[in-house]
């Protein structure tokens, strides 16, 4: 299945879920290959190429940091992540707690230093974590003293150059271990001279060994069932005429003087500027689609193609607390 390249147009990080096939995430700091069941948190500027179905989710109030991170969650999470995609299209500003928690780990990459020379060194190491270039040589490349470069790292990140590099390697190693690479392989891939060196660095930066750090995390994410999809109620207004498609389950759409109960596969038109109440049942997913893109045989790929097209993308704005209070007595489901 061929889809257009996805470019993140927001100024904040984006969550990317590979639902089908495989693709490439081209992030500012690294290039990541993904397959079905992978979720990636990428900074502003990331774009997707390839033939997989990758759902981009933008959450303005979610600070995911400056580094790209990937987890393999398994395809059992598909419906739960499509629900998360729906939340982003319906105006939510933060991911669900269970999704945000996936990236709240002790192997988070270290902060990128701000001074120009140190930042360029950091960017080189982010692109090539196994690079063995010593501090002195990096300093000479940037025409500064090694002391100055060291001070830049410490002042901006709290780490010496060597510890910053170790912290970065630990973060990359955690990602590789999550994808079933052996510890010995990972040690070499990220630039440690021996498995024992990786283990010591892991203990310093996470408090655990690679095996004890990875196993509980991946058991929790990959082996357990994803959380149930909760029932949701959304009060919103569209900037343009849109169609609301029930991807799965059931939902009730209420506008002034109108109420409709809907099942999977059905669509309803919501005119521009109309205050709308959307009640989605537990276990169900509803997706807004530009009216021009709606048809009788919609697929997830159709919604994706429309959502990443800046000329057709749906803009659905949540009602403010005051606006919701004003319409709540009017928008009462009657079915």
Swiss-Prot record:
<protein>
    <recommendedName>
        <fullName>HTH-type transcriptional regulator RipA</fullName>
    </recommendedName>
</protein>
<comment type="function">
    <text>Under iron limitation, represses the acn (aconitase), catA (catechol 1,2 dioxygenase), leuCD (isopropylmalate dehydratase), narKGHJI (nitrite/nitrate transporter and nitrate reductase), sdhCAB (succinate dehydrogenase), pta (phosphotransacetylase) and katA (catalase) genes.</text>
</comment>
<dbReference type="GO" id="GO:0006355">
    <property type="term" value="P:regulation of DNA-templated transcription"/>
</dbReference>
<keyword id="KW-0678">Repressor</keyword>
<dbReference type="InterPro" id="IPR018062">
    <property type="entry name" value="HTH_AraC-typ_CS"/>
</dbReference>
<feature type="DNA-binding region" description="H-T-H motif">
    <location>
        <begin position="136"/>
        <end position="157"/>
    </location>
</feature>
<dbReference type="GO" id="GO:0003700">
    <property type="term" value="F:DNA-binding transcription factor activity"/>
</dbReference>
<dbReference type="GO" id="GO:0043565">
    <property type="term" value="F:sequence-specific DNA binding"/>
</dbReference>
<dbReference type="InterPro" id="IPR018060">
    <property type="entry name" value="HTH_AraC"/>
</dbReference>
<feature type="DNA-binding region" description="H-T-H motif">
    <location>
        <begin position="183"/>
        <end position="206"/>
    </location>
</feature>
<feature type="domain" description="HTH araC/xylS-type">
    <location>
        <begin position="119"/>
        <end position="216"/>
    </location>
</feature>
<dbReference type="Pfam" id="PF12833">
    <property type="entry name" value="HTH_18"/>
</dbReference>
<dbReference type="InterPro" id="IPR009057">
    <property type="entry name" value="Homeodomain-like_sf"/>
</dbReference>
<keyword id="KW-0238">DNA-binding</keyword>
<keyword id="KW-0804">Transcription</keyword>
<keyword id="KW-0805">Transcription regulation</keyword>
